[in-house]
């Protein structure tokens, strides 16, 4: 492969779509704390002065949707009308029904191992050894820029920052290996008291330089910091936000394929979420085991059916054993039935709010990021 550029973007926790994701997952977590068997599909819409929480939820738990919503928005940092959105005064509307009994009868079984998939669909997982967390570098560093923006905003280092922000990082590759960073874009909402010059200098010194490795930066690296010159109006006042509208930010930044299903607000019986997590777990363990440098796995399901309808592995010519053998190892060491993968990854726990910003993958606190099967896979593959 010759030289090429590849770009990924991330958005902050204060981006309207991410506000919606975090509210949906905060509701999910609160319900799972009380009712592990709950069925949750929670969607959120945010716009100036308003939050609408809807969806299908079947549970014996009781949660205060309004209180959860206000707390989530406040935690993000929207606590003043000066920012265009205020957790204390925004309207919170709720429109929640129950899961269709037609779906439910295909999911629940007397034998939990025969629990059917909550819907048909295709899911992808991916891993690459180009970073220490076995994720593509462009999305990894785009996320880290956004995490840094939130940190210096919340700790007072840059008090004029506001919650809404976006990042974009373009990496240059040479024969598939990272050769450097070609371009960095960072746009951040700010108070109207800061000048463009001061903002650009502060963002460079306090956000970009502490995050991006110096060895990948050069005199030819291009920086675009608030390139429009002004970003005062942001958050839900600037754009409406919806749950599930940042699926590429949530996953691999475009470096791998995506089945189309969003994650936030869905309990683990929804394979859109849980099987995508399991696919990442499989791919990461294959790469951690040294069986391939890059690995993409596709799984598919039929509604109400436990066994996956297909498993496909793509290793882009980097495999150390043939792909049929890889698939045999996946079937041997990973239970990809809905109930099996829920148990394998201990997914019935309130951990989802923290997934809803800065990516679902490449963050070691999540169970699907474990590499506990790597040694077993390597041994079974006969590699020393």
Swiss-Prot record:
Report the pathway entry.
Answer: Amino-acid biosynthesis; S-adenosyl-L-methionine biosynthesis; S-adenosyl-L-methionine from L-methionine: step 1/1
Q: Name one GO biological process term.
A: one-carbon metabolic process
**Catalyzed reaction equations:** L-methionine + ATP + H2O = S-adenosyl-L-methionine + phosphate + diphosphate
Taxonomically, the superkingdom here is: Bacteria
Class of enzymatic activity (EC top level): transferase
User: PROSITE patterns per the record?
Assistant: ADOMET_SYNTHASE_1, ADOMET_SYNTHASE_2
Predominant location of this chain? Answer: cytoplasm
Where are the stretches annotated Flexible loop?
A: 99-109
Which key words tag this protein in UniProt? Answer: ATP-binding, Cytoplasm, Magnesium, Metal-binding, Nucleotide-binding, One-carbon metabolism, Potassium, Transferase
Naming one, the record's GO cellular component terms include: cytoplasm
Query: Which residues are L-methionine-binding?
Result: 56, 99, 239, 270
This entry's Enzyme Commission designation comes to 2.5.1.6
The keyword Amino-acid biosynthesis is annotated on this UniProt entry? no
What does the UniProt record say this protein does? Catalyzes the formation of S-adenosylmethionine (AdoMet) from methionine and ATP. The overall synthetic reaction is composed of two sequential steps, AdoMet formation and the subsequent tripolyphosphate hydrolysis which occurs prior to release of AdoMet from the enzyme.
Q: How does it assemble?
A: Homotetramer; dimer of dimers.
Designated name of the protein = S-adenosylmethionine synthase
Species whose genome carries this gene: Edwardsiella ictaluri (strain 93-146)
